Amino acid sequence: MKKTHITEQKFADLGLKPQVTEGLEKKGFEYCTPIQALALPVLLTGQDIAGQAQTGTGKTLAFLTATFNHLLTTPEHEGRKPTQPRAIIMAPTRELAIQIFNDAAPLIASTGLKAALAYGGESYDKQLAKLQDGVDILIGTTGRIIDFYKQRVFNLNNIQAVVLDEADRMFDLGFIKDIRFLFRRMPEPKERLNMLFSATLSYRVQELAFEHMHNPEHVVVEPEQKTGHRIQEELFYPSNEDKMALLQTLIEEEWPDRAIVFANTKHKCESIWGHLAADGHRVGLLTGDVPQKKREKILEQFTRGEVDLLVATDVAARGLHIPQVTHVFNFDLPDDCEDYVHRIGRTGRAGASGHSISFACEDYAINLPPIEEYIEHAIPVSDYDASALIQDLPAPLRMRAPRTQQRRTNTGGTRSGNRKPQGRRPRQPRQSAPKQS
């Protein structure tokens, strides 16, 4: 393992409960990442923390390890019923909640503690049945957690550990009132272990920590640069007319093992999906309108390698832990500078390298200057040869049409339908202009 990603701190030397160490070792976790090495020694003394770390740094394992260990070392409240959670982990999106639950699986197995999910978009009754079976750790989104609370499925009187993940995103999505509602129904901050993690410790996030935590210690892991030194960035200036052909030509040239294509609107994502699906790619669509069960299935297929391309809005840009994403395509430059960082942060994770390709088109080139100012460097620019772009593209599929997803077929078909890689070279690299000081 590379020392740039893994420290010399061993989990086995932290004084964790044997059941916790066993769960970590079974998943191959021996050495801590920087955020784990900084946060865990503090948390294991019972001290609250407010941690700043980008996604992909191992913060999920940090707070899961601390939560499970705390529950094993702290006696539960006298008279607690099995349906009353002892710990609560709040996430901004259901996808992130599900991912946290999945990441907790080895610790659930090794410790015997019970975890349950609560998030919108899935059957209330199914989640209710799981909760009624008993729960030690409740993982979910604030809206559904409040629904269960108001229906008196559980109370929060026995909470001994609290995690607020992606706190800055919670603010962005307008969940701060829900968070405060839940905090005010828990025991006093000094009576529980509190963990807050955020990509940025902005003033509003620090204010939340001050209000609902007990003298939290600030733990900061700054990336060497906002976009990650293992991510190769590249920028094109296509016309609106050339964008789709350029995307498909670059996909053919790059031949990514696993790639995410981001666009700014649901309708644009559907259009991109239609073009790629018609061309025979195994492609999934992830937007806010896709039903929850479908979203989960698509993410599972993408993670297992059954889908090679994922077209998504920014709903998938934060918090999801999808391994081995080799490429990110920004079909549209995002309106929010932080979204650019979070999008391309889907690749180049856990010490791996990645490639980010962005289009500064007629509609969204205006977003480039603030993005480059935010990331503190100019994105290298490549020209392209319009005559080298793919021309023989089929008509796009419509959303009502069946999704054949035939990028790789059992009959030995190629990854892009009947067209084999042609070795096109649309790029004409050029030096980016020096940034004005």
Curated annotation (Swiss-Prot):
Helicase C-terminal domain span: 245-390
Q: Name one GO cellular component term.
A: cytosol
List where in the cell it is found.
Cytoplasm
Read off the PROSITE patterns from this record.
Answer: DEAD_ATP_HELICASE (PS00039), HELICASE_ATP_BIND_1 (PS51192), HELICASE_CTER (PS51194), Q_MOTIF (PS51195)
Q: How does it assemble?
A: Component of the RNA degradosome, which is a multiprotein complex involved in RNA processing and mRNA degradation.
Q: Tell me which InterPro entries the record gives.
A: DEAD/DEAH_box_helicase_dom, DEAD_box_RNA_helicase, Helicase_ATP-bd, Helicase_C-like, P-loop_NTPase, RNA-helicase_DEAD-box_CS, RNA_helicase_ATP-dep_RhlB, RNA_helicase_DEAD_Q_motif
**UniProt name for this protein:** ATP-dependent RNA helicase RhlB
Positions with biased composition (Basic residues): 417-428
Task: Show the segment(s) annotated as Disordered.
Answer: 395-437
Q: Please give the CDD domains that the UniProt record associates with this protein.
A: DEADc, SF2_C_DEAD
